[in-house]
């Protein structure tokens, strides 16, 4: 797969969640119809919660803390907000001959693990508790959450990675429906980097990891 066929769109301002959904839905139609390139879209949302298709009412602990959006991605409740890098990935699995959802999710996981490794963070992808995890202070904590949707074999939604996120904002939900584990960020792990620094490595590792994903 030639990587000049993939567009990278990096936002400098926060993007409204509903606007992002509308954009992705139109873009995946265009990708399916062959009139637009595949896209990796890097952005940040204002503070909000999203409820995936597996969300349970009881996992919303505080219903007036931030706006709550029902969404068609897989997964349960999660938080998005400042200090969190969102990577929405829109790839055509069919043209890549990779109509294998599990393989796609694992490849996303490897991408994030390799990116974090560049910053000397040892992490791992857990296929059962979907996400990328680290061991910090003797306990396992999630640093990156996954939620995807596939339509006509074109992917959308993606990954959120905590860079310098206010972790107290997770207090209004049971993140991803998992009660027994915590949430962390690069800042909490002692890694202080900018979005710009992170994005450069994210793109480099994407090209490496996805080079065989075709």
From Swiss-Prot:
Alphabetical list of Pfam families matching this protein: LplA-B_cat
Further remark: In the reaction, the free carboxyl group of octanoic acid is attached via an amide linkage to the epsilon-amino group of a specific lysine residue of lipoyl domains of lipoate-dependent enzymes.
CDD domains reported in the protein's UniProt record: LipB (cd16444)
Listed InterPro entries: aa-tRNA-synth_II/BPL/LPL (IPR045864), BPL_LPL_catalytic (IPR004143), Octanoyltransferase (IPR000544), Octanoyltransferase_CS (IPR020605)
Phylogenetic lineage: Bacteria, Pseudomonadati, Pseudomonadota, Alphaproteobacteria, Rickettsiales
Reaction catalyzed: octanoyl-[ACP] + L-lysyl-[protein] = N(6)-octanoyl-L-lysyl-[protein] + holo-[ACP] + H(+)
Gene Ontology BP, a term: protein modification process
Residues with site note (Lowers pKa of active site Cys): 142
EC number of this enzyme: 2.3.1.181
Intracellular or extracellular location(s): Cytoplasm
Keywords of the record: Acyltransferase, Cytoplasm, Transferase
PANTHER family: LIPOYLTRANSFERASE 2, MITOCHONDRIAL-RELATED, OCTANOYLTRANSFERASE
Binding positions (substrate): 73-80, 145-147, 158-160
Species of origin: Ehrlichia chaffeensis (strain ATCC CRL-10679 / Arkansas)
Protein name per the record: Octanoyltransferase
A cellular component term, taken from the record's GO annotations: cytoplasm
Domain BPL/LPL catalytic: 34-214
Domain of life: Bacteria
PROSITE patterns reported for this sequence: BPL_LPL_CATALYTIC (PS51733), LIPB (PS01313)
């Amino acid at each position: 797969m030639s990587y000049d066929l993939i567009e990278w769109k990096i936002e400098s301002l926060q993007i409204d969640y509903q606007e992002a959904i509308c954009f992705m839905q139109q873009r995946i139609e265009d990708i399916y119809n062959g009139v637009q390139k595949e896209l990796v879209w890097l952005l940040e949302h204002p503070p909000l919660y999203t409820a995936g298709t597996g969300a349970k009412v009881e996992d919303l602990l505080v219903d007036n803390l931030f706006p709550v959006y029902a969404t068609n991605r897989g997964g349960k409740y999660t938080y998005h907000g400042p200090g969190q890098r969102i990577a929405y990935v829109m790839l055509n699995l069919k043209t890549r001959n990779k109509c294998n959802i599990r393989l796609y999710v694992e490849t996303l996981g490897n991408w994030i693990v390799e990116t974090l490794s560049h910053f000397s963070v040892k992490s791992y992808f857990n296929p059962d508790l979907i996400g990328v995890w680290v061991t910090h202070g003797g306990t396992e904590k999630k640093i990156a959450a996954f939620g995807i949707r596939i339509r006509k074999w074109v992917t959308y939604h993606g990954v959120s990675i905590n860079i310098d996120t206010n972790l107290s904002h997770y207090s209004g939900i049971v993140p991803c429906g998992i009660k027994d584990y915590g949430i962390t960020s690069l800042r909490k792990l002692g890694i202080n980097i900018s979005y710009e620094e992170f994005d450069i490595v994210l793109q480099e590792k994407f090209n490496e990891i996805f080079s065989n994903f075709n």
